Amino acid sequence: TYSRASQARMTNSSGVIVSVGSGVPRLGHHVWNGSAWVNEGLLHESEARTNLVPHSEDFSTTTNFWGPLTTSTIAIQPTVTDPTGTNNAYLYTPQNGGIGHQQNYENVSIPSGNTYTLSAYFKKPSSNALNHAVLAFSNNSGYGAVAVFNLSTISVDTTGTHPTAAAVLDANITDAGNGWYRCSYTINHMAGMWVVHVGGSTVPGYGAYSRNTAGDGTSGILIFGAQCEAGNTPSSYIPTAGSAATRAAEILTVAAAKVPNAGTKTPIEVSGTEMLTNPGFDTDTD
């Protein structure tokens, strides 16, 4: 039997992130392989995850949920399709010169002593595009941990952290299809940070610990779907609209009588790739 006590997201055959109802297995989850959407079978996450970013999609200067933009601008792009198939992508444009990462930030609850992964979706606009995506944790005054990603070479440019703020564990960029890339940055939070930043840069790293980025006043980057979660990997997208939100753990229960006996030499085969944070069956009951 299968159970999950919440909605969850998966990617369909068109490359659109869609919602799946509570208790419904995420069958037919697709992954972009660089040229086509491939059916990976069942997307199964046996660990609950919480997106700690209160507003994962609303970067508007009207609502001001995200921090002030004193040296950059941001605007929704009604003609751009975001990864969920809607039009909630924003264009972030840093002004000319060095930009502190106190731009486009939101407060999150990330107690020290834990591992956190920050992720977001980025895309280069059709013109005047920034090549570099930026993710950062900080205290909003230059004390932080930053990762910069190259959207042209599809690689991690650089990571940096204040030596007492965090330890860098990992950084990755994944092709999410339709020109979008999901970038993620994992740290061990040591002390003193409580905001996350999502942005872009004209250069792969600027200033001590890569804590600053740079703009030219005209080039921008499309952003969508900010997510910060406890854990050492990014999980499936969890949208938020005012407060943190949780995707429940998925549980597979296999009756012992239905598990093949080793003496029969009948293998248990998994078709497709499961996204497992805790591999293996959660429950084995009679």
Where are these regions (language model features)?
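Glycine- and acidic residue-enriched flexible segments with recurrent GG/GxG motifs
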Residues: 1-286
